[in-house]
Design a protein with these regions (language model features):
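Long amphipathic alpha-helical segments
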Residues: 58-127
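Charged, amphipathic alpha-helical oligomerization/scaffolding segments
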Residues: 11, 15-22, 41-48, 52, ...
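Surface-exposed polar/charged interaction patches
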Residues: 23-33, 48-59, 82, 86-89, ...
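Intrinsically disordered, low-complexity regions
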Residues: 4-6, 14, 40-46, 105, ...
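Acidic, proline/glycine-rich low-complexity IDRs
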Residues: 107, 122-196
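Phenylalanine-focused residue identity feature
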Residues: 9, 16, 26, 38, ...
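Residue-level recognition of alpha-helical structural elements
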Residues: 34-38, 112, 134-138, 142
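N-terminal interaction modules that seed assembly of large macromolecular complexes
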Residues: 2, 7-8, 14-72
Length: 196
């Protein structure tokens, strides 16, 4: 158990937990943001999240049970829709690092909102398990999150950063000024997070 405590209370682990919690809060507040502010903040928090995830110390699973899942399909969909609403027509981008791209003659379309919601789901489940304060489950959630970063959401994060960079810096004639304040039409008061 000593090794477990060293990993979960390591400086890099604690910093990752802090940034992951900040990311989750940022995504949960997305529906209140204007696109420009949202994109600017995302382009600051995503590289930090990537850096902190890459510094998580090596760890090994110690439990045999699956960890509790906190983010429901409804929660995921609410986050995805909120980000899609903020991004508007700039939510879509062309994926160039998809494995199927080698066999495709046509571009593969992805959505910033789906990528950010996928990252959110993994991190929110991690944060919720970590907040329970049980060393064994904290360790396992950290190990699983590190594994998912390497295999899944790390690549989505950098792909999404590329798309967000394009939204911020690519001057497009298709984008009109009214598009910048997309959240003003958001009026669905039913959407609440079950776990908050």
């Amino acid at each position: 158990m000593e090794q477990t405590s060293q990993v979960i209370f390591d400086k890099n682990s604690i910093e990752f937990v802090t940034v992951a919690a900040e990311y989750c809060g940022f995504i949960e507040r997305a529906r209140d943001a204007e696109r420009k502010t949202f994109v600017d903040t995302a382009l600051k928090i995503l590289p930090l999240l990537y850096l902190k995830a890459s510094l998580i110390p090596e760890c090994e699973l110690i439990g045999e049970e699956d960890l509790e899942v906190f983010v429901t399909e409804d929660d995921y969909e609410m986050v995805r829709r909120a980000v899609a609403h903020v991004m508007g027509p700039q939510d879509d981008y062309l994926e160039v690092f998809h494995p199927d791209m080698a066999y495709s003659d046509t571009p593969i379309k992805k959505c910033i909102s789906e990528d950010l919601a996928d990252i959110y789901q993994d991190l929110k489940d991690f944060i919720c398990v970590f907040q329970l304060g049980l060393n064994a489950t904290m360790n396992d959630s950290l190990c699983i999150c590190k594994e998912h970063f390497a295999e899944f959401w790390g690549q989505r994060l950098v792909n999404t950063m590329r798309a967000l960079h394009d939204v911020k810096y690519n001057i497009s004639t298709d984008d009109d000024a009214d598009d910048a304040d997309a959240p003003s039409g958001w009026d669905n008061d039913e959407d609440e997070f079950d776990f908050l």
